[in-house]
UniProtKB/Swiss-Prot annotation:
A Pfam entry, by short name: ABC_tran
Lineage: Bacteria, Pseudomonadati, Aquificota, Aquificia, Aquificales
Record's protein name: Lipoprotein-releasing system ATP-binding protein LolD
Binding site for ATP: G37, A38, S39, G40, S41, G42, K43, S44
GO biological process: transmembrane transport
Alphabetically ordered keywords of this record: ATP-binding, Cell inner membrane, Cell membrane, Membrane, Nucleotide-binding, Translocase, Transport
Species this protein is from: Aquifex aeolicus (strain VF5)
Cited InterPro entries: AAA+_ATPase, ABC_transporter-like_ATP-bd, ABC_transporter-like_CS, MacB-like_ATP-bd, P-loop_NTPase
E.C. code: 7.6.2.-
ABC transporter domain location: 5-224
Subunit details: The complex is composed of two ATP-binding proteins (LolD) and two transmembrane proteins (LolC and LolE).
GO molecular function: ATP binding; ATP hydrolysis activity; transmembrane transporter activity
Cellular location(s): Cell inner membrane
Topological type in the membrane: Peripheral membrane protein
EC class of the enzyme, as a word: translocase
Length: 224
């Protein structure tokens, strides 16, 4: 499989403390990679750098073979909106908007006609079992439903790579299974995924797991 993402010697220093200590890794097209580790191991910091939400102190990141310029905010914004999707532990839905409107926002931001954006939003929410709740606002949805809206929003612009930071952290076991089933289906469709989790049983569902400790990758398990 072709390489979609590569990181070389990533370091991150915050207030004199070295959070990441020279991490190198790659993600292939269609691969589902999990990153596990204790709290404070640096896994979320690494995910944010790979997802272009934060810049490394040192090191390079390549997306589809092209080096990312972290000093060019315009380019970063375009890459994030056109090629990447994000799902977080907290969904960050806009409370004043309906489920459908929340999903449409990133498409309109990229210039998609409103009719097309609405049709895709309806399709995504229906695929995620929310076809009857398009007009509900976040407070009218359960935690699991809110997270599914967030996943639909992350998929709105058909990303090549999806990043997930503890996406099931606030969910019960039934909703955790549902979200993971959705991720596996998305991955089977060809979207690469990088997921941070502290739950080893979830990591075991992925193609490859990287284990972090004290800002370093200390172990790797490949299942395929």
């Amino acid at each position: 499989m072709a390489e979609i993402l590569r990181a070389e010697n990533i370091k991150k220093v915050i207030r004199g403390y070295e959070i990441l200590k020279g991490i190198s890794l790659s993600v292939k097209k269609g691969e589902f990679v999990s990153i596990i580790g204790a709290s404070g191991s640096g896994k979320s910091t690494l995910l944010y750098i790979l997802g272009l939400l934060d810049a490394p102190t040192e090191g390079k990141v390549f997306l589809e073979g092209k080096e990312v310029d972290y000093t060019n905010e315009k380019e970063l914004s375009l890459l994030r909106n056109r090629k990447l999707g994000f799902v977080f532990q907290f969904h960050y839905l806009i409370p004043e908007l309906t489920a459908l409107e929340n999903v449409i926002v990133p498409m309109l931001k990229m210039g998609k006609p409103k009719k097309e954006a609405k049709e895709r939003g309806e399709y995504l929410l229906s695929e995620l079992g929310l076809g009857d709740k398009l007009s509900r606002k976040p407070y009218e949805l359960s935690g699991g439903e809110q997270q599914r809206v967030a996943i639909a929003r992350a998929l709105a612009n058909e990303p090549i790579l999806l990043f997930a930071d503890e996406p099931t952290g606030n969910l019960d076991s039934a909703n955790t299974k549902r979200v993971m089933d959705i991720f596996l289906k998305i991955n089977e469709g060809g979207t690469s995924i990088v997921m941070v989790t502290h739950e080893r049983e979830l990591a075991e569902l992925t193609h490859r797991t990287l284990e972090m400790k004290d800002g370093k990758v200390v172990g790797e398990i490949t299942r395929v």
